[in-house]
């Protein structure tokens, strides 16, 4: 719900003030693609800003990133993310200098350099602050939210570790798994399953 609220705000721009909305018209597709990629893959902001156009394999629907520590990894993209990125590249990014191979570029000045980590943090904060429920949102909170939702869906901490690119599974378990309620619910469901209702007859006890 929080992810969709953030993306809806970025798509419409309605939550931004007039000045920010006017500026956002030039970067709307870029900003939306950034927010969608962060919330839809859980990648680090440093990994996102390091992506070049050539790092995207459109046929296999994967993007190459440089993980923490310098190792290369491939992150899968769903069809929606592929379409979002293609729209950004076709309708907005193509107006920039072709000599710059970075996927996400700054719209300031004439050089249109690669976006920095801090620039992306400001973009996320801008849309987060404009949405009441997400005032303190950051790229890292999007990453953590992705990891938490993936675990709730899969109940597989190893899958989450792989998706987030953690070398140590303890980091995944301690910092990205916020699932205490569902754990209790699953324990209750398991114990209930051990007691078949058809076998219970108080008269025979």
Residue locations for each model-derived region?
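Conserved catalytic core of the tyrosine transesterase superfamily
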Residues: 1-205
